[in-house]
Amino acid sequence: MNKARPIISGAVGKYYEFQITPDFGQGKVSLQDAWLNVAYIPQAQFQMGKYKAPVNLERLQSDPALQFIQRSQVQNLVPNRDIGPQIWGILFNKRLTYNLALMNGVPNNTSSSDFDVNDAKDFNGRIFLTPFRSSENQWLKGLGAGFGATYGHECCSTTSTYKTWGQTTWFKYNSGVTASGVRWRLDPQGYYYWRQLGLMAEYAVDDQALNLISTNKGVLTSQTHNFHNAGYMFQASYWLTGENASYSYVKPRNPFNPFDPFNGGWGAWELAARVSNVSNQTRQFQLGYANPSVSAKTATEFAVGLNWTLNNNVKYWFNYALTEFYQGAGTTARPTDLPAESVFESQLQVAF
């Protein structure tokens, strides 16, 4: 079972909102979300607790609304959930959303362990514009674009590993490598929705200072360098049954009715395709931070999906993903390419 998340949410009085989301999936128990939001005015709200870091567009999209079971390779370059306070708001008749957060700081594609073990912190910021949201122009109404970023100083923390759709590790740093110094991330992002068509694109850059402690001929050496890794994703989707595409969960025009399928009760069917890529800076292999016979320099994922939304609560995904690599096998002197990974995955989700 991939996810089992009974969401407890509500409001205390008029201005206080809360959410607690435990997860019992994958044979373990974890706390995904636990936050309190104070919303006296929509333009300047205050949130505190554990929640999705306000950086990445794909990450911030709710799970039921996703076109694919697994998010793209870009997630290897951005944070997942973190702990801290944020000020955020919605301005100009919902045309602009902003977030300013002070977070504990987590490695890429990971969530906070619920404990802060050092004094280092990350500043997260995001701004997203939907300038034509209230326009009568249907061609521009569904256009949105924004920018997310983080900046922080890491001290002796572990580095993250990069994983495929099938959760195979395709990149990791050598032993003796720790994050030690400034780390920043940039994430330009955008989407476009028009009638049944949906498009989403994102580009992410992760730059961090890494320290390598190694032994050479019995002599202990230490070196610190900055490296940046970059990635992109682009996806397109189309509702075959005529629903209007959206960043939010799409409800079927005609919910599935097995007793009357010939009168339109087939639910909603969506076709989706995605390409995503992460490229690691070559210099970190040359300086001994990573081994090209163990870790790939690049991974490119191609994914297609056919999704069936039966009603307002039930959705079925049928996804296929092919991931190709450059290097990651062989020997250090003569690295070869990792074999491509091919995954077919289906998922039935009940959300209420």
PLM feature spans:
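Outer membrane beta-barrel
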Residues: 1-155, 228-263, 268-286
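Outer-membrane beta-barrel pore domains
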Residues: 38, 139, 149, 157-352
